[in-house]
Amino acid sequence: MENKNVFGDSLMICSENPLTGYFRDGCCNTDDTDLGLHTVCIIASTDFLIFSTESGNDLSTPRPEFNFPGVKSGEKWCLCALRWKEAYQNNCAPMVVLEATNEKTLEVVTLDELIEHAHYKAEI
């Protein structure tokens, strides 16, 4: 079954450089094996990366054994929905590319919360 975005449309690519996604296919695709629900396409910020590291999830350090290049500020990445929600609750949520964010995210986060942090192409 095709993964859809939060609007019910085809899921757009989040990032191919760095190559992101649970399946490392550039999209925030998911299935039942994705226990972390890596479904939110974010644009990482320095504040968010610091928050994530201080919360025990270091996204900045490369981990080649997991095919993980490390995330830098300004890069797009498929983030776990619960991690985004935690950052949101702590006023550190990164911007979100809604068209590339999987509709499964809505099981954890409301569309209104995502829209508050929506990144639009005109802002790039």
Where are these regions (language model features)?
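Short, basic/aromatic beta-hairpin or loop at an interaction surface
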Residues: 43-58
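Short, compositionally biased
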Residues: 84-107
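Short alpha-helix capping/helix-loop boundary micro-motifs
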Residues: 60-67
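Extended boundary segments
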Residues: 1-47, 119-120
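Residues that flank catalytic or metal-binding motifs in active/ligand-binding sites
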Residues: 38, 73, 94
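Glycine- and charge-enriched low-complexity intrinsically disordered segments
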Residues: 103-124
